[in-house]
Swiss-Prot record:
Keyword Transcription regulation on entry: no
Induction (free text): Transcribed from its own promoter, as well as another upstream of the preceeding gene (AC P40182). Expressed when grown on glucose or galactose, levels decrease as cells enter stationary phase.
Xref: InterPro entries: ATPase_NBD (IPR043129), ROK (IPR000600), ROK_cs (IPR049874), ROK_glcA (IPR004654)
EC numbers for this chain: 2.7.1.2
Primary location recorded for the protein, binned into one broad class: cytoplasm
Stored PROSITE patterns: ROK
Gene (UniProt): glkA
Identification of the protein by name: Glucokinase
Catalytic activity: D-glucose + ATP = D-glucose 6-phosphate + ADP + H(+)
UniProt entry tagged with the keyword Endoplasmic reticulum: no
Functional description taken from the UniProt entry: A probable glucose kinase. Required for glucose repression of many different genes, restores glucose kinase activity in E.coli glk mutants.
Family the entry assigns: Belongs to the ROK (NagC/XylR) family.
Taxonomic classification: Bacteria, Bacillati, Actinomycetota, Actinomycetes, Kitasatosporales
Subcellular localization, as worded in the UniProt entry: Cytoplasm
Residues reported in the UniProt entry to bind ATP: 6-12
Length: 317
């Protein structure tokens, strides 16, 4: 079909990239993310125009955080942008003069990993992103499954603990409250408060107090064998693996692809997740067990996936 542009709307920058049919990024253009909804639309158009210079572009795919309708045109609701029933497709098309599709950013990243990253060779995969929160995407039979209204795969808000921790969504006990970057930092702070003698390495990396602990400190301390840091990763993995076991019962994929910032830690995170997953998988000793694979595209997955989805007339069900 030719070259397409993928757009990734980040908290601080909007990135647009020209992507070929093999998932290669040929050029990129980045602009700062504005603070107002209409200015963000203008910034998306600016990023697209900057990236398309010198290329013949056939379509644009935009990855947006929030709920996107099944027609891939309107953002129902975006938690960090004041978009409510935002006709994003229509507005961007009017500015850039190209066909535009809009996709949930986690779905776009999942598609990118499935098509060009860790999911290559699989027909049925579940992707989860372990970052500040927890997101994901469902690919079954080589199709991205979005549900009847287009808002499936909000895995982070599956209720794991009835009457559990309060979530930013307004519910309680959501999975991302127990398996995410925020959860990891909370575990480390709690453990450092309770047993500071087991957190000396970790505390020394910050300001010397539990409140000063950051995610980057936990990674460094864990690799140095700090007991509190290692235990914090194990607790995160316990919840992540338990959730994967539930998803296996629902979807029976051949593989789980784990992406997001926490996946950059490699086997420090993935090995205990695999162990927890097998521990909680019903009939795990007697049935085939899906692989748990690290994502390969890093922060490029959303841009590449959005660009590729723009080529498809309707790949989503």
């Amino acid at each position: 079909m030719g070259l397409t542009i993928g757009v990734d709307i980040g908290g601080t920058k909007i990135a647009a990239g020209v992507v070929d049919e093999e998932g290669n990024i040929l050029s990129t253009h980045k602009v700062p993310t504005p603070t107002t909804p209409e200015a963000i639309v203008d910034a998306i158009a600016s990023a697209v125009e900057g990236a398309r210079v010198g290329h013949e572009i056939v379509a644009v795919g935009i990855g947006a955080a929030g709920y996107v309708n099944r027609q891939r045109s309107t953002v129902y609701f975006a938690p960090n942008i004041d978009w409510r029933q935002e006709p994003l497709k229509e507005k961007v098309e009017a500015r850039v003069g190209l066909p535009v599709v809009v996709e949930n950013d986690a779905n776009a990243a999942a598609w990118g990993e499935y098509k060009f990253g860790g999911g290559k060779g699989h027909r049925n995969v579940i992707c989860i992103t372990l970052g500040t929160g927890l997101g994901g995407g469902i690919i079954i039979g080589n199709k991205l499954r979005r549900g009847h209204f287009g808002v499936a795969a909000e895995f982070g808000h599956i209720r794991m603990v009835p009457d559990g921790l309060l979530c930013g969504c307004g519910s309680q006990g959501c999975w991302e409250q127990y398996a995410s970057g925020r959860a990891l930092v909370r575990y480390a702070k709690q453990r450092a408060n309770a047993t500071p003698e087991r957190a000396e390495v970790l505390l020394a990396l910050g300001d010397g107090t539990p409140d000063g602990i950051e995610g980057k400190h936990i990674s460094v301390a864990a690799r140095q064998g700090c007991p509190v840091a290692v235990d914090s990763y194990r607790e995160l993995a316990r919840w992540a693996g338990a959730g994967l076991a539930d998803l296996a019962s629902l979807f029976d994929p051949s593989a789980f692809i784990v992406g997001g910032g926490l996946s950059d830690e490699g086997d420090l995170v993935l090995d205990p997740i695999r162990k927890s997953y097998k521990r909680w998988l019903v009939g795990g000793n007697w049935r085939p067990v899906a692989d748990v694979i690290a994502a390969q595209l890093g922060n490029k997955a959303g841009l590449v996936g959005a660009a590729d989805l723009a080529r498809e007339p309707d790949p989503i069900m």
